[in-house]
Amino acid sequence: MSAGDAVCTGWLVKSPPERKLQRYAWRKRWFVLRRGRMSGNPDVLEYYRNKHSSKPIRVIDLSECAVWKHVGPSFVRKEFQNNFVFIVKTTSRTFYLVAKTEQEMQVWVHSISQVCNLGHLEDGADSMESLSYTPSSLQPSSASSLLTAHAASSSLPRDDPNTNAVATEETRSESELLFLPDYLVLSNCETGRLHHTSLPTRCDSWSNSDRSLEQASFDDVFVDCLQPLPSSHLVHPSCHGSGAQEVPSSRPQAALIWSREINGPPRDHLSSSPLLESSLSSTIQVDKNQGSLPCGAKELDIMSNTPPPRPPKPSHLSERRQEEWSTHSGSKKPECTLVPRRISLSGLDNMRTWKADVEGQSLRHRDKRLSLNLPCRFSPMYPTASASIEDSYVPMSPQAGASGLGPHCSPDDYIPMNSGSISSPLPELPANLEPPPVNRDLKPQRKSRPPPLDLRNLSIIREHASLTRTRTVPCSRTSFLSPERNGINSARFFANPVSREDEESYIEMEEHRTASSLSSGALTWTKKFSLDYLALDFNSASPAPMQQKLLLSEEQRVDYVQVDEQKTQALQSTKQEWTDERQSKV
């Protein structure tokens, strides 16, 4: 905002939020009151950290605010109890501001209140102007509508009491409707009570302002708003002698009824508007049987006791409707007129249902009657108030179906839902009829099971023992060992029976080494073939190599070990010394 928008500036002490009045500090800030009405901006109260700050700490919107001096209990801090405190309350927060002097406080209060009140006045003027700026074809100004109604009422003959009462009601209701002081014409206002015998009964949910709009619209004001309505929404008087009594219709809010003759002298003021005459004449329909009904009888009661008529042929539906409209509008005098009302928010819910029926009536009747072949409500035999009854009404009892079907009806035009009245056109099937046989082999995607395998001609597989390679010593043990060594080995063999297999392997290697030292030329093959391999066993049925070793005899079993001579000699000497020590202790 520019500096020219500033109305008042100065230092004020600002309060913290209301929940923190006693705990938090009150800060001194530089306040600027700006009025942005001339530039199109809202009225705000800004406060800065100091006088030279460019960005405000907070902007307080004064569109909905109130300002007053603080008078009452001293709930502010002690250091500000004797100061001049005023309150600015907005929709979001309440600000307690402390001024230095009383004059400064008066200036701030006056400036803020002037900005707030002026803003409210301008907002109200803008809202009123937005209402009066609507197109004149839809909503003319209130003064012009009032003058038009007054001129129309003055042009009417004075000998008609109903017309005078209508004009009086229009003038009085217009004065109730106009709430703007600039557009209220007091010279045309009249006071008094409404005579209920002059106008027909209306729905209580409509307000007086709504009624004044509809009555003013009759006098050539809302001419372009008139549109022909279907005959199902007309309400006819039940007795010719009384104009105030009328038969209740399905939607009384959809039309405004004027119970007076249209072709008489009161029609003089409508002669200047051919559009209005054509609109009114197109919406007139008088029922032929309506005059024969007793006073107070309701059309809904008659329809509830009478079955629906036979519907016309689908091809002649549109022709019969046109003939019916032309016959009713041209042959008889109209007894009542239909003026569509201008619906406000109070009657918006009722207007939605009425508008949906007006727009989709032709499509709904054509589709439903052609598809369901149900009775149509455009028959001249019954009143048009049958619109309140369900479209798809069908008698569910045999009596109603029989009475609805006269001698002139054919069963192809109207078929009731009762199966007992009309036999089925389909021929009956014999009781002993069986379905045709089905070839099970022709089913698609049927897979046959493969034949089982024949294992009778196969020969029996015999399991062979695995081939093992054994090695025997060509000479006996005792031929190379002295009697002393033999005794020592036998004693060691029986002393440690747990490690018998290990002992045996080392004894055997020792014998080989002794034999090689005695006759190196004869037994050179022992060193060359010191490592041997077992044959691979591919037969799973044969016993495992470990199990086969256990089954062999002790002399045939050979352990294949690659021996380190130095380690073996050291181990043998250690075992020898250990055995000697144990024997000496015994």
UniProtKB/Swiss-Prot annotation:
GO cellular component: a single term: cytoplasm
Keywords of the record: Phosphoprotein
Biased amino acid composition, Basic and acidic residues: 316-326
PTM comment: Phosphorylated on tyrosine residue(s) after macrophage colony-stimulating factor (M-CSF) receptor stimulation.
GO BP term, example: macrophage differentiation
Electron transport in keyword set: no
Single GO MF descriptor: signaling adaptor activity
Compositional bias (Polar residues): 283-292
Keyword Acetylation listed: no
Domain PH: 5-117
Family, similarity comment: Belongs to the GAB family.
Name of the protein in its database record: GRB2-associated-binding protein 3
Gene for this chain: GAB3
